[in-house]
Regions:
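Hydrophobic beta-strand scaffold residues
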Residues: 41, 163-164, 192, 222, ...
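ATP-binding N-terminal substructure of ATP-dependent carboxylate-amine bond-forming enzymes
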Residues: 1-170, 174-176, 180, 199-209, ...
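Phosphate-binding site of ATP-dependent enzymes
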Residues: 236-323, 344-350
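Conserved metal-phosphate-binding beta-hairpin within the catalytic cores
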Residues: 262, 271-273, 329-362, 370
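Active-site nucleotide/adenylate-binding loops and adjacent lid/helix of ATP-dependent enzymes
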Residues: 2-13, 17, 25, 126-133, ...
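Active-site "cap" helix and flanking loop/linker of ATP-utilizing ligase/carboxylase catalytic domains
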Residues: 286-338, 368-395
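Glycine-rich phosphate/pyrophosphate-binding beta-alpha loops
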Residues: 145, 232, 287-291, 355-369
Length: 395
């Protein structure tokens, strides 16, 4: 009997965003739990300069080792460096890396290295696509934040006609933009907190005027967020006017547009969505941060946050949370999976945002919700890859 051919999965991780370390952790977890009987695993790490490096498969990559893997070595006859914050051990043979790169990262990625950050694909050069497609069956996108979760890599993979996990270009871009997604939620009849947006130019031109605008339209406490970041990067809760300028300055470091939201007092929950044409809502998870809010540290440090799944809300409210999570997921045109962040206040459910590539680290919310639904992490990865290979219409 002929042995069934394994599915070749490239795990795309790392990248240039502020969420690089989260991405590496997500990638490491995926690599560890993928079934080697079904999959040929190709880890692909994008370094801080945007360079792509295919690495050997290691069943248990070590995130603890953040030393330089190989310093200032020639890779594919180019002066590239293995990223200093690699998830892999430093004992890997350089020749093995070169061999893997020759096999999996063919002409189009060498072109990308030259063109980065400006993508310059030759649409008439069909050889580019033909060279790459036999090497990879599907890409598991483990990137987070801008230039990973915002539609850019999704567009590249669409051009190359390569299936990938998660949502398409439009849904990814909308999910990354908190301002546009809030406008869409409102149009879809989904409750959102009161908000205004302020751009850097207006802020610098007249800070006092913008502070008055915030006081009059939102008040305190207020939530300050960069429009295009995830993992609570650059987010602050401001309780009084004297702390506002500092919080705005922090948010503007990450994005030229800042969202100022009404603070909703209530129970913070997240609800995962899984599926393509007929997605299901997973059991909601309740988030109880030990600090002021569910910030970057609380999200990725288990001791900093208590997470309870299923959430301690009524059965009726659970159904309501799941209903609006599905509604938000569909409003953006998401497919595959997502995680919808919400607040329950009294009888109301406020949708905060949709994460089109939820974290899949050991500390992440989405795998815990899947587990509560009876789905193991390995099975979850199988489902996500299967959903990607179904090749649904992606927007």
């Amino acid at each position: 009997m002929e042995e069934k051919k394994k599915i070749r999965v490239a795990i795309l991780m790392g990248g240039t965003s502020a969420e690089r370390e989260v991405s590496l952790s997500t990638g490491a977890n995926i690599i560890e739990y993928l079934n080697r009987d079904k999959y040929e695993v190709i880890p692909v790490e994008i370094d801080k300069n945007g360079r792509w490096i295919a690495l050997p498969d290691q069943k248990k990559p070590s995130l603890a080792k953040k030393q330089e893997l190989i310093k200032k070595q020639k890779l594919n006859k180019k002066q590239s460096e293995i990223p200093t914050e690699s998830i892999f051990n430093e004992e890997i043979d350089l020749k093995e890396i070169e061999k893997i790169n020759d096999k999996y990262l063919s002409s189009e990625f060498k072109l990308l290295e030259k063109a980065n950050p400006i993508l310059a694909l030759n649409y008439e050069d069909k050889k580019i696509i033909k060279d790459f497609k036999p090497a990879i069956d599907v890409v598991f996108i483990a990137l987070h934040g801008p230039q990973g979760e915002d539609g850019k890599f999704q567009a590249l993979l669409d051009l190359l006609d390569i299936p990938y996990t998660g949502s398409g270009v439009m849904a990814s871009a909308l999910g990354m933009n908190k301002l546009l997604s809030k406008r869409l939620f409102t149009q879809a009849g989904i409750l959102v907190s009161k908000y205004i947006d302020i751009n850097l130019e207006d802020w610098q031109e007249n800070i006092k005027k913008q502070i008055k605008k915030i006081k009059d339209k939102i008040g305190f406490p207020a939530v300050i967020k960069p429009v295009g970041q995830g993992s609570s990067v650059g987010v602050s809760i401001v309780k009084a006017e004297e702390n506002l300028e500092e919080a705005m300055k922090l948010a503007f470091e990450y994005d030229p547009i800042v969202l100022v939201e009404e603070y909703i007092k209530g129970t913070e929950v997240a609800c995962g969505i899984l599926g393509n044409e007929d997605p299901i809502a997973l059991p909601p998870i309740e988030i109880v941060p030990k600090g002021e809010f569910f910030d970057y540290t609380a999200k990725y440090t288990p001791s900093e946050c208590e997470e309870i799944c299923p959430a301690r809300i009524s059965e009726e409210m659970t159904k309501k949370v799941q209903k609006y999570a599905l509604k938000a997921h569909k409003a953006l045109g998401c497919v595959g999976f997502s995680r919808v962040d919400m607040f329950v206040s009294g009888n109301d459910v406020y949708v905060s945002e949709v994460n089109t590539i939820p974290g899949l680290t050991y500390a992440s919310l989405y795998p815990k919700e899947a587990k509560a639904a009876g789905i193991s992490f390995s099975e979850l990865l199988d489902r996500l890859i299967t959903l990607a290979l179904e090749n649904p219409v992606k927007y």
